[in-house]
């Protein structure tokens, strides 16, 4: 879970084809996620105490769409401070988690040791995963607020194909690009559906605490469904399934109302817009 975009912000758009070098963007995002990791691990939103006591943090969406993971090698991309990774490890998966934030990875390693689990955590840019993780996996997994931090999905998809064993599964559950078109309060459409430019935002707070002492610029990109699917297909993966969900399993947006336990709508748009999608793709 790496929710991210639109906590409390003002935004502007830049043409990233002109900007060229993304390193400065990745570094700014890393610094911001280092701040967030400290706040998030102590938040009610993540309920770390409940997780330590045995509660699951995975949602019915991914649990219903991924088969038994026992003894399967799983690579978790953009794992934040490791709760989802360690939940999969509890279910028997042999997990390696990757994240850009060194603070988050350090917290993940501490939590892994505290829980007596055997997951491994690697700090690197997700696009450089193949340079840092020298094995292939039965499952590559990523979820909720991850791909928006990447300017181009073709290198991402190629990396995924490289990291998968033949016959391996790639699975993503992600917030729907329609959600990212709106302003913070969901009053009007502010951003393009397609990946046209980098979205630069001045942030205050985070989705677990709008008043947290977290400030800084972040850089993100919107990705259409066709861009995601075509990147995966172009990498040689075969799409097995694509599903859309008319709710969010997390209250990480403003103006949300819980209409059923563990399911949230945007107030005034109840059941009218897709909020999450999932994809299963396999390496033949």
Task: Label the predicted regions.
Residues 208, 219-242:
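Short alpha-helix
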Residues 131-140:
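A short acidic, Gly/Pro-enriched loop at the edge of an enzyme's catalytic core
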Residues 235-237, 258-284:
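Core SAM-dependent methyltransferase catalytic element
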Residues 16-70, 83, 87, 169-206:
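Conserved class I S-adenosyl-L-methionine
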Residues 154-169:
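A short glycine-rich, Lys/Arg-flanked "PGG" loop and its adjoining helix->strand segment in the class I
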Residues 6-14:
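Intrinsically disordered, low-complexity segments enriched in serine/proline and basic residues
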């Amino acid at each position: 879970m790496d929710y991210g975009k639109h906590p409390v912000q003002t935004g502007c758009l830049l043409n990233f084809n002109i900007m060229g070098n993304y390193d400065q963007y990745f570094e700014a995002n890393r610094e911001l996620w280092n701040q967030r990791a400290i706040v998030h691990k102590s938040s009610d939103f993540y309920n770390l105490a409940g997780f330590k006591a045995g509660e699951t943090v995975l949602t019915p969406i991914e649990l219903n769409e991924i088969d038994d993971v026992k003894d399967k090698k799983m690579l978790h991309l953009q794992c934040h401070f490791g709760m989802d990774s360690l939940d999969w490890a509890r279910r028997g998966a042999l997990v390696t988690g990757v994240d850009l934030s060194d603070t988050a990875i350090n917290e993940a390693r501490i939590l892994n040791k505290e829980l007596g689990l055997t997951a491994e955590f690697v700090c690197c840019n997700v696009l450089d995963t193949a340079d840092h993780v020298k094995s292939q996996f039965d499952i590559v997994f990523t979820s909720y607020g991850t791909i928006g931090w990447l300017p181009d999905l073709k290198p991402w998809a190629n990396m995924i194909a490289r990291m998968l064993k033949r016959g391996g599964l790639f699975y993503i559950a992600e917030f729907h690009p329609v959600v990212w078109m709106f302003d913070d309060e969901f009053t009007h459409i502010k951003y393009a559906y397609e990946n046209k430019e980098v979205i630069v935002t001045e942030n205050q707070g985070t989705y677990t605490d709008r008043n947290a002492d977290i400030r800084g610029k972040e850089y993100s990109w919107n990705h259409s469904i066709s861009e995601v699917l075509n990147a995966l297909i172009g990498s040689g993966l075969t799409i097995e399934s694509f599903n859309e969900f008319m709710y969010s399993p997390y209250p990480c947006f403003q103006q949300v109302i819980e209409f059923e336990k563990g399911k949230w709508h945007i107030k005034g748009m109840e059941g009218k817009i897709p909020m999450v999608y999932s994809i299963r793709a396999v390496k033949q």
